[in-house]
Design a protein with these regions (language model features):
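Conserved mixed alpha/beta catalytic, RNA-binding, or beta-rich assembly cores of soluble enzyme
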Residues: 61-63, 75-81, 182, 186, ...
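Glycine-rich, aromatic-flanked loop segments that form ligand/cofactor-binding clefts
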Residues: 97-124, 157
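Iron-sulfur cluster-binding cysteine motifs and their immediate structural context
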Residues: 136-166, 171-172, 182-199
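Extended, intrinsically disordered, low-complexity segments
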Residues: 13-28, 39, 117, 355-413
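N-terminal amphipathic alpha-helix/helix-capping segment at the start of soluble metabolic enzymes
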Residues: 2-53, 105, 410-413
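Non-catalytic positions within long, well-ordered alpha-helices that form the structural scaffold/packing
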Residues: 70, 132, 140, 144, ...
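Glycine-rich loop at the start of a catalytic domain that most often binds anionic cofactors/ligands
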Residues: 89-97
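Active-site mouth loops of central-metabolism enzymes
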Residues: 44-61, 113-134, 167-176, 189-203
Length: 413
């Protein structure tokens, strides 16, 4: 049995007292709201989801990210549809609750796809023996997940350290860390890197949905046709009834988007016993790049806001989201702006048109740079064993979650 986490530092508890007070104040504005707190957040427009990555399977990092963002107050943690990853998310949530017992546990969501063309479900692959030994390794430098590790080693019988041809490259892609962003594909000067796509097994997905530690599912679809979605939906069968929320992630495919969404919703209605959500996927896996990455998801929201025939459900931004997303939403007049809508499970109510924001690459980046500070000799470190780093990571997470939730500005920890 793992030892209990160290007592939380006083500053951590103080910061959470302020966070909880702010959250309580927000909940108080919806007196009489008997929906789960996650749904109440969607109605207000202050839902926040952490995206660990549909293909990111580094359990140690997922655990620490889940711990930190649970403490920061996210409503949902979205992860790969893999049993070990789901276990890591729940372990992180449990440790967060042991540090601050009053913390709200987020829903755990698994992500699957109906089509191998979805960019979130692929891994980079190459053979380092095919790489020239004098390669400058741009793939290693550009990877946001530190998923490529290459080292030049000497070839037996050759002893010149100064001559690159006397060595070879070893290593390659760290598969569990690669989440398919594709940035390495375009920078390889020798075109040696391939993207290997895959589709999650619906049978294994159905088994995960029957567990008591999975609350939601997100189905990624390309918007290129409903047949594959319908097939996946049929294969999941009654297992879909075990979750509280069903999300569909899709790109803006232009004028046909709303018709496609309505066709999907018609299929879903046969088993839709809980809540449903539409994830507006703007520019996938790009939030860590910079300010402009968030434009596409906000434009998608603006597009749908003018469509009176859009299907019922909550709406949430993703794909390129970062610290500039709220500013862009405000400029568009869509940040926590209410509308009269019918939502599955919540009928005829005033609620925010954009229920919230999902943060992926950017959220992982700002906390990940703290995780990387933990000395390497600790191996797969538990961040709670390093209180100073935990506080620093929490400060980073709060800087992202706080503006959506309306938390008071906290002093530097």
């Amino acid at each position: 049995m793992a030892p209990p986490p160290p007592p939380p530092p006083r500053l951590l508890l103080a910061s959470h007292a302020a966070v909880r007070a702010a959250a309580s104040a927000r909940r108080g504005r919806l007196a009489g709201d008997h929906h789960p707190p996650q749904v109440a957040a969607l109605r207000r427009g202050d839902w926040v989801k952490l995206i660990c990555g549909a293909s990111f399977e580094d359990a140690a990092d997922v655990r620490n990210l889940s711990l930190v963002y649970t403490l920061a107050g996210v409503d949902c943690i979205d992860c790969a549809a893999d049993a070990s990853v789901v276990g890591a998310v729940n372990e992180g949530i449990d440790v967060a609750a042991s540090i601050v017992p009053s913390v709200q546990s987020p829903w755990v969501m698994i992500s699957v796809n109906d089509d191998c063309r979805d960019l979130h479900f692929r891994k980079a692959e190459f053979d380092p023996e095919d790489c020239p030994p004098d390669c400058s390794k741009p793939c290693e430098k550009v990877c946001p997940a530190d998923a490529i590790s290459l080292e030049r080693v000497m070839i037996e019988g050759k002893h010149s350290q100064s001559d690159p041809s006397s060595g070879k490259l070893e290593g390659g892609v760290i598969t569990e860390r690669c989440y398919g962003c594709g940035r390495c594909l375009s920078v390889c000067p020798y075109d040696r890197i391939r993207a290997m796509s895959y589709v999650r097994d619906p049978t294994k997905t159905a088994e995960l949905l029957k567990r008591n530690d999975v609350d939601a599912i997100e189905i990624h679809t390309t918007g290129k046709g409903t047949d594959m979605f319908n097939t996946l939906w049929s294969n999941l069968d009654d297992s879909i009834n075990n979750v509280k929320l069903i999300a569909v992630s899709l790109p803006d495919v232009g004028d046909s988007t709303v018709n496609f969404m309505n066709a999907i919703y018609t299929t879903m209605q046969s088993h839709l016993q809980g809540y449903n959500l539409w994830q507006l996927d703007g520019r996938p896996m790009s939030g860590d790049i910079g300010r402009g990455a968030t434009r596409e998801t906000v434009s998608f929201a603006v597009h749908l806001s003018s469509m009176s025939n859009r299907p019922p459900g909550f709406y949430q931004l993703a794909g390129g989201t970062n610290s500039y997303t709220i500013e862009s939403l405000k400029k568009a007049g869509l940040f926590q702006s209410t509308t009269f809508a019918a939502t599955s499970g919540v009928t005829d109510c005033q609620q925010a048109f954009i229920g919230g924001i999902a943060y992926g690459g950017y959220a992982r980046k700002i906390v990940g740079r703290v995780l990387r500070k933990i000395p390497a000799q600790f191996g797969h470190a538990r961040i709670e064993d390093h209180p100073d780093y935990l506080l620093e990571a929490l400060q980073e997470a709060l800087s992202l979650v706080g503006p959506v939730k309306g938390y008071p500005t906290l002093p530097s920890l």
